[in-house]
Amino acid sequence: RDSSTSRGLGDVYKRQDRAYSTSIFNAGSTVGALAAPITIPPLARYFQSIGVGNGWEMAFIVIGGLGFIWMGLWMFLYKKPNVNPRVNAAELEYIEQDNNNPEESKAQQAAANDFDNKKISFLQCFKFPQTWAVFVGKFMTDGVWWFFLFWTPAYISDVYGFASDTGTAQMLIFVLYAITMLSIYGGKLPTIIINKTGKNPYAARMQAMLIFALFPLLALFAQPLGNYSYWYPIIIIGIAGAAHQSWSANIYSVVGDMFPKSTIATIVGIGGMAGGIGSFCINMGSGRLFDYAAETNMTFMGFEGKPAGYFIIFCVCAVAYLVGWIIMKALVPKYKPVDA
């Protein structure tokens, strides 16, 4: 999904608008998470009532089938702007502003077009620091998102005693996901920075990502404030989730700033692989830490047992984005397309 969509956005949006458009498609997963609790259980109960197994199997098949329907629509309806009859002349002119900049000579425009058409093999991608910047940015941060996604229901149950099927727990999760929808506005920030400062898209994105990297620091206070109300950690996790989605939208757009269009999907795929590795590490490590904390009644910063384990992971999540940003900035200090 991420690879193909990022490649498509590279065709239909100019550079300064890509982060905003990416934040919109990124928010789709949040909409799905909000819709899942009110659609999948009723479907499962219906299929169970008519004797189709336990109901859950067919419910998942139906939901998964929607993805194939969307894939079919994409394959038949998507066309590049220059051959799409639904794109008018004014829209096409706006989209192609990056390629038709009046301040650039014809030679510069030709060089830019040649760059976008260059082919880079999968293995060659790893010789560029830009690739490793994306790799590190995804490795350090995707695991935080998936930790919050997978472990928050368990956190609510372990710390506050609300089972995931109770109304209170479902309301807390709903509010958390609703807050993450704020990420749509985060995708707009680089455009605002570009318009106000005249910075190049890469510099504007890195400035925006630094701002987004500061919000997860609030996770340091989630556990202590949770002593007063369970709403505090939920709101903080929601804000951190919104910051992650804004960060993610911009890191996808950074790929389009530095790599040829023909290579965008490959680099996004490499970033996705890095994010998967990071997610595996933090989720497996968290599970083992929580088991150890419960078995040994471990103490940390005034917390005992599993709450101590959660506080440790919250601390890791809080600083992950800032560490990732620093490494990315060290690898690619200034805007520099790959020397393909």
Which role fits each region the language model picked out?
Residues L123-G187, H244-S248, Y252, S279-G287:
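Extracytoplasmic gate region of multi-pass secondary transporters
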Residues F25, S29-P85:
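Helix-loop-helix hairpin linking two adjacent transmembrane segments in secondary transporters
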Residues D2-L9, Y13:
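Single conserved hydrophobic/aromatic residue that forms the stacking wall/gate
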Residues W70-Y78, A219-L225, Y310-A340:
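Multi-pass alpha-helical transporter architecture, strongest
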